Amino acid sequence: MGICKCKKRSEDFCFNHKKFICDSCVVADHSICYIKSYVSWLTDCEFEDSVCGVCKGKFDVDDNDDSVRLLCYHLYHPECIDVYVAALPQNSSVESYPCPKCPEPILPSNDKQSLLANSIRDRFSVSSWAGDYLKSFKKQNSNSNNNNNDNNNPKSNGITNGINGTHINNATSPEFYTNLDSIKSNGIHHHHHHSNNSNNNNIINPSLLEETPPLSHLNSNPYGLASRKHEHEDTVIQLNSGTNSNISNNIHGNNKIYDDDYDKYNKRPVNPISKIINNIKETKPKYLIMITVAIIVFLILISKMGSNSDSNDNIVGDNNNNNNNININNDNNGGNGAINEETLNDQKIPNNGQ
């Protein structure tokens, strides 16, 4: 499910332009494009140029009348559809004629209202097989529109009195105030009115005069709308002053939602710095774990290196001590040998002299 450029949700996807489209935009901007569901595009995005489903011929890009797209989005030449329909059984109804490729009907149903459905009706309105059916549809549609207009715009030329059923002119018409003048000049009072309605069917009920403003205040405005207008203006001013901030907040909020929806499927420029920052934010726990593990390994290596250096120092010290002991022993042994030889020589010399 995606969003078309006109903000409508749609599952249809244009393979040529690689974007979501609705049944309204397909008529204006994608008249001969290859269109299928978005799931089909995800499955296989390869497509060929659109050709007629009956004659397999290509369409003229510059001629919009050269092709017609049905509600199932299959494309045909209008002449090929006419030939295809002529070969169908005559006992079948016009609205049930199926598409040459699928069981969907060629003509849209009466309750289907869209730009695509209207374009199909306009295209086949000149065909002999669909002309009568489409004319009856247009006639029925025009009658329903007239009935809706009559219901929405009732004729109200006056107000009916709920007491005696007499018809009263609109209070804003000049005739209303003319009748008021005549009633006051005839001496009719508000509180002494009797129900003598047979002779006064066309005269306003005098009890209504209590709600009408005096004529002396209508010199500047004969319709008596000035005071009411000012009251409404004061009300509007108070409403605007009290709700100005709320309205502005709602407008900004709606614009924000609109911008988010509009930019949802648009490509944004890639900023390397912001991309790196976003990646760091997304992978922050991973980086913390990696940094912690690296610090622990570093401390372990340092401790092992320190212990190895201490053991090496001890070994070197022992070797030096052994060497010193050996040298001392050698020195001692060498001195004793020299003394013994001298003593021996001293002893031998006298013996030789004898």
Curated annotation (Swiss-Prot):
ZnF endpoints (B box-type): 1-41
Membrane topology: Single-pass membrane protein
Biased composition (Low complexity): 196-205
Keyword annotations: Membrane, Metal-binding, Transmembrane, Transmembrane helix, Zinc, Zinc-finger
Region (Disordered), start-end ranges: 139-167, 187-225, 326-354
One GO cellular component term noted in the UniProt record for this chain: Golgi apparatus
GO MF annotation list: zinc ion binding
Tree of life domain: Eukaryota
Cellular localization per UniProt: Membrane
Major location category of this protein: membrane
Transmembrane region(s): 287-307
Similarity field: Belongs to the ZFPL1 family.
Name the record gives this protein: Zinc finger protein-like 1 homolog
